[in-house]
């Protein structure tokens, strides 16, 4: 059992806490801020532009070498990785407290830049956490360490995506206090990080004479993929597969608020119960991919995750009720998780084992970068099409990927 292992190995407990801290900012950007803005009367077209902060998670691969090769002055006395973790967690605490002092109804400029800063600091924190985890554990225990980190990440998202909404409601929408408390959690986490043991490794310094070989190392995985048949077509299928779902997710929380659901209902049903539906759906998605080949599994889960968007059209016509939201979240999260599992499985299959890490990063970065960029305009589409028209549009967005997969299913034997 994962929980038993965590309590037996203190290193896993450290990774659990770091995972929790890693997951907290993402839920703030995805959910908490959008709910706050919606209740403050900010237009949906403006709310979704805050999603630009998510781009840091897609682009972090470009500054991750800095985390490997440069130390933070003074703070690195506690360790190379810990220096970056302490810096990021301290700054995130200050950013969150500053965010709570802003008034969205009066001015959005400062809050906008603070949100972008939070995304950048959070993604940088993630890089350092992953590096610390990989450094601390032996090869045979990397699996349990990764599972612990993911478990903690989910808890962190529940804290700021669920508990924070509930706390804001019971304090009469005192968002300043809510963000202050979250900021204090990050401040306390900074103290904890100082106590974490870091395994110091001998790191090779960058040499200018090795730049040519470094470029070759980076480019080779890309050349390997693009040499294969239908490479561009496959890449487009990966990019479009989750686009409709990403568009839907970007406006979901403001949509619930507009329908009249309370923050506590969103916290309990969408975040807490929704996590259970997601876990079950992910498991079933794995079975589907095992039972069918890659393309057929993707087509099945792709169709399911797109048609479940009709549930939101149905929800839009219902008076606010616990049961209606529960049904919608069950259907949507279950199918979306099936699609995510299928996509991860397919991407993993596509990777050449010789270049697995870089090629996997290529696919995930291409997909998330496209999704995070396009979803910025989701609010404008809602204003143009209305809620039901927007939901139909998200269903249509899934069609290119499905048509491409059907085509590839006939052409490629995988």
From Swiss-Prot:
Keywords: Cell inner membrane, Cell membrane, Membrane, Transmembrane, Transmembrane helix, Transport. It comes from the Bacteria. The keyword Membrane applies. CDD domains: MFS_AmpG_like. InterPro entries: AmpG_permease/AT-1, MFS, MFS_dom, MFS_trans_sf. The chain crosses the membrane at residues 15-35, 44-64, 83-103, 109-129, 150-170, 176-196, 231-251, 268-288, 297-317, 324-344, 360-379, 385-405. GO terms for cellular component: plasma membrane. It is a multi-pass membrane protein. Signal peptide: none annotated. Disulfide bonds: none annotated. It is found in: Cell inner membrane. One of its GO terms (molecular function) is transmembrane transporter activity. Gene3D superfamilies: MFS general substrate transporter like domains. Belongs to the major facilitator superfamily. PANTHER family: MAJOR FACILITATOR SUPERFAMILY DOMAIN-CONTAINING PROTEIN 3, SOLUTE CARRIER FAMILY 33 ACETYL-COA TRANSPORTER -RELATED. This is Putative transporter AmpG 4. It comes from Rickettsia bellii (strain RML369-C).
